[in-house]
Amino acid sequence: MSVPSPVNESLLSQGLGALGSARSWASNVLPELERFIRTADDYDLFRVNPIQYGSLVDLSEADAIELFVHAAKVGLFEMDWLLICAYCPQVAGSFRELDQVHPRFQCAFCNAINDVALDDYIQVTFTVSSGVRDIIFRHPEMLSVEDFYLRYNFSNLGSLGDIEV
């Protein structure tokens, strides 16, 4: 695990305060999210799946999703819609808004032609805001070859043979 990138204390504090005002959370929710933002590896803060996060911190799916939606609203995270190839774990596109998604695409990795199905090949993910913590995955030109091809370009919910992505 690499050394965590620095945190903008002011923005983190403001965001957590706004998040705490958004609704009443269980007592451990905001301290656990703060710990996650401060100490997680850069890759763990890139394209976070709120359901997976919730299972790690004993938070229901509904509460985990609500936490990340509110966290995006207050600027702690940014929400993205990822278009995933149906045949490999390639992220074919990352969109802030669904109206940018085209009905058909060709995968740059496996060359397969894909018809977009919103319920099957779209993932909603959250990445820590660059103002809060500027992770290396926001700078793909600085990634190692392995990180660029196997972590940046692939969905972290897929796998490539024996290599977990």
Predicted features and spans:
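Basic, alpha-helical nucleic-acid-binding regions used in initiation and control of genome expression
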Residues: 87, 91, 97-98, 102
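Cysteine-rich micro-motifs
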Residues: 100-113
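Long, charge-rich boundary regions
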Residues: 115-165
